[in-house]
Amino acid sequence: MSGHSQFALLRQRRFLPFFAVQALGAFNDNVYRQAIIGLLFYLGIDAAQRTLYTNLAPALFILPYFLFSALAGQIAEKLEKQKLIVITTTMEIAIMSLAAVGFITENMVILLIALFCTGLQSTLFGPVKYSILPSVLKPEELTGGNGLVEMGTSISILCGMIFGGLIFQIAGSHGPEAAATAVIAIAVTGNLVARLVPRVDAGAPELKINWNPIPESRAIMRLTRRTLAVRNAVLGVSWFWFVGTVLTAQLPTYAQLNLGGQQDLYVFALALFSIGTGAGSLLCERLSGRTVEIGLVPLGAFGISAFLLDLYFARPGAAPATGLSIGQFVQQPGSVR
């Protein structure tokens, strides 16, 4: 395996269609969320209400993860995985059709309901995203394959946020129609690609699903507390996504007030964050020696915390100058840090 490269997986049907499906899903989620923000500017919503919606949107998206993750895990164990991927991408088409109605009618209530449903669809897809890899990859390919998936997710999030943020700027008065068309087209593409994913047998087809998520969630919490490695991994991964969600939600305000930048500086900062996430994902294979090394997770969580603390001390207050372009910002003292 000395000549093994994780990128070789991208040429294989057992991996590529799934990789494309999850990347398209992450891309569409972020196109949709950023297009909602674009609609707020298009409608001339005041800054206070924009801030409210900007923080409410990720909360509504994440809430289904908290409520239904245990149930989603059971469903992923019971159903054949390719079938479940097709089901969830079909759900995405229906949800984005509802979102399209919200865009065209400029109705924020419909858009927020669709956003919650998008979170629910992503919750159902999540367990498949992680459980399918051990079924289609060899043990020595798992870390590299997972790194590729995380890299693809990071790049898709970045591209989705940029594209979604530009829809209303490019389309102008046709912004609502353009946003509606985009999210439906991406969802349909994802569903078509999902049908190319090879069949993978269900993990526990005889499992009787408990539709009450509360006892299942408690059972998972008990298992997590009993197993130190699992507990550390859960805490580390949860911390990563918590920090990522908070940063991406607050980055527009931080780039403007603390960095003194224009819109392009926000996109630049977002790109650096996403590139760093993708690079770290790819490095996991080399750092772990192509084995599943769970000990890297708490180390990564510690690194996130340390660099966040340094970010605060690098610019604890308001920017000394405003309206800076990327070129002007990098010439400011301390910009490299």
Question: Which stretches of residues belong to each language-model region?
Answer:
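Short amphipathic helix-loop junctions that connect adjacent transmembrane helices
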Residues: 34-51, 249-265, 269
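Helix-loop junctions on the cytosolic side of multi-pass membrane transporters
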Residues: 129-131, 135-136, 140, 176, ...
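Substrate-agnostic recognition of the 12-TM MFS/MFS-like secondary transporter fold
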Residues: 16-34, 57-95, 110-169, 187, ...
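Juxtamembrane intracellular "pre-TM" segments in multi-pass secondary transporters
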Residues: 1-16, 200-236, 257-258, 326-333
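A membrane-interface helix-boundary motif in multi-pass transporters
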Residues: 50, 55, 108, 166-187, ...
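C-terminal ends and interior cores of transmembrane alpha-helices
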Residues: 90-106, 302-334
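Transmembrane alpha-helix termini and helix-breaking/packing motifs in multi-pass membrane transporters
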Residues: 35-46, 98-105, 158-183, 257-258, ...
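Helix-loop interface residues and adjacent transmembrane-helix termini in multi-pass membrane transporters
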Residues: 12, 48, 78, 104-105, ...
